[in-house]
């Protein structure tokens, strides 16, 4: 076997390992559940989308849930963001980020409590996040 053939074999094997390793990760399905914890008697409007999928506007009464299910993409860059509105507030948050949520939310629903101070992920150890900067 000459050097060129060995190089092509090594390159092919490396590519296959990368390809199949990535495919194993790509099958991760995440269920996102959003809860209106803004406060008593406060309706929460929300609108979630990704760069290519619009989930439409929703309206949640206090303590009401709404959610969606998403298979993470091959490259691990899935991103869904939501716009939240209540009373005189308008906030944005990246509700599903593959790199942040894959491990925590792969086996259990990714439950988000939406609070005035920011969204808190209840899955696993509770962790609160700041709202996205307003553009």
Curated annotation (Swiss-Prot):
GO terms for biological process: rejection of self pollen. Keywords: Glycoprotein, Secreted, Self-incompatibility, Signal. GO terms for cellular component: extracellular region. It comes from the Eukaryota. Glycans are attached at residue 88. Residues 1-26 form the signal peptide. It is found in: Secreted. Coiled coil: none annotated. Its main location: secreted. Belongs to the plant self-incompatibility (S1) protein family. This is S-protein homolog 20.
């Amino acid at each position: 076997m000459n050097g060129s053939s060995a190089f092509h074999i090594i390159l092919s094997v490396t590519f296959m390992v990368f390809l199949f390793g990535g495919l194993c990760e790509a099958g991760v399905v995440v269920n996102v559940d959003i809860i209106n914890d803004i406060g008593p008697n406060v309706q929460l409007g929300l609108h979630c989308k990704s760069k290519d999928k619009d989930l439409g506007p929703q309206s949640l009464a206090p303590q009401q849930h709404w959610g969606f299910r998403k298979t993470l993409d091959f490259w691990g860059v899935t991103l869904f963001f939501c716009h939240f509105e209540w009373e005189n507030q308008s906030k944005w948050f990246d509700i599903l980020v593959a790199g942040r949520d894959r491990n925590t939310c792969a086996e259990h629903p990714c439950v988000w409590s939406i609070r005035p101070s920011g969204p808190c992920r209840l899955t696993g150890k509770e962790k609160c996040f700041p709202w996205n900067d307003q553009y």
